[in-house]
Amino acid sequence: MENLGDLAQGLALLGKYLGAGLCMGIGAIGPGIGEGNIGAHAMDAMARQPEMVGTITTRMLLADAVAETTGIYSLLIAFMILLVV
């Protein structure tokens, strides 16, 4: 009977770690794709209008920060899964 309790505790830990890993892994896909698109379009815009490099860079960094928020939220949720559950 004692082994059954250890098995249940081990499965609970497995679920917790697997859930946090999936949360972070899947939650990082969107920001990665979004930031890549932002960077690609910013480079295209800088190649077309070299005189606007400063403005384009500023807006690119701001858009990257906004795109990264979902990754940060998934990191916070992963930490909550690890520490609270």
Swiss-Prot record:
Pfam families: ATP-synt_C. One of its GO terms (cellular component) is proton-transporting ATP synthase complex. Keywords: ATP synthesis, Cell inner membrane, Cell membrane, CF(0), Hydrogen ion transport, Ion transport, Lipid-binding, Membrane, Transmembrane, Transmembrane helix, Transport. It is a multi-pass membrane protein. SUPFAM superfamilies: F1F0 ATP synthase subunit C. InterPro entries: ATP_synth_csu_bac/chlpt (IPR005953), ATP_synth_F0_csu (IPR000454), ATP_synth_F0_csu_DDCD_BS (IPR020537), ATP_synth_F0_csu_sf (IPR038662), ATPase_proteolipid_c-like_dom (IPR002379), F/V-ATP_Csub_sf (IPR035921). F-type ATPases have 2 components, F(1) - the catalytic core - and F(0) - the membrane proton channel. F(1) has five subunits: alpha(3), beta(3), gamma(1), delta(1), epsilon(1). F(0) has three main subunits: a(1), b(2) and c(10-14). The alpha and beta chains form an alternating ring which encloses part of the gamma chain. F(1) is attached to F(0) by a central stalk formed by the gamma and epsilon chains, while a peripheral stalk is formed by the delta and b chains. F(1)F(0) ATP synthase produces ATP from ADP in the presence of a proton or sodium gradient. F-type ATPases consist of two structural domains, F(1) containing the extramembraneous catalytic core and F(0) containing the membrane proton channel, linked together by a central stalk and a peripheral stalk. During catalysis, ATP synthesis in the catalytic domain of F(1) is coupled via a rotary mechanism of the central stalk subunits to proton translocation. This is ATP synthase subunit c. It comes from Thermotoga maritima (strain ATCC 43589 / DSM 3109 / JCM 10099 / NBRC 100826 / MSB8). The lineage of its organism: Bacteria, Thermotogati, Thermotogota, Thermotogae, Thermotogales. The gene is atpE.
